[in-house]
Amino acid sequence: MSYTKLFGFVIATATLLLAACGGNQANTDGPVDVKVALGEFTIKSSVTEFKPGVQYHFIVTNEGQVAHEFMIIPVTMGGMGMAGMSMEEKDALALMMISEEELPPGATVEMDYIFTSVPEGSIEFVCALPGHFEAGMYSPIAVK
């Protein structure tokens, strides 16, 4: 085998090996889809751990029989502190919110969101409508 053919074979093999090793990189071409299903009285998400600076595309579907809202909110006063708050106070805490008018039964709403920094303490996905949060309609998430 000539040196030229041997060199070409080595380069081709190295290129294939390097290409095969490069598949674990994060997809930076677009937002990360997050599918969220709301029901009575549950929140289920395809993603529960998020990174600051990454764009997430939330696809929120109300699979329940009553209207719900979807909020990303810091946990206050051990979580149940929301029980004594007005709706205006809850809305003011929201990092992101889709209102109950937008989420009647069967509705799907899509929204993009970027966690710009890690909020202090814990955060949750929440439906803060009267009685919904108290019935267990929240789900802890992490931003790391």
Locations of regions flagged by a protein language model:
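Bacterial N-terminal signal peptides that target proteins for export
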Residues: M1-V10
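N-terminal edge beta-strand
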Residues: D29-Y56
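Extracellular/periplasmic metallocenter environments
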Residues: I98-K144
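Asparagine-centered strand-capping/turn motif at beta-strand->loop junctions
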Residues: V60-G64
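Beta-strand signatures of extracellular beta-sandwich domains
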Residues: E69-I73
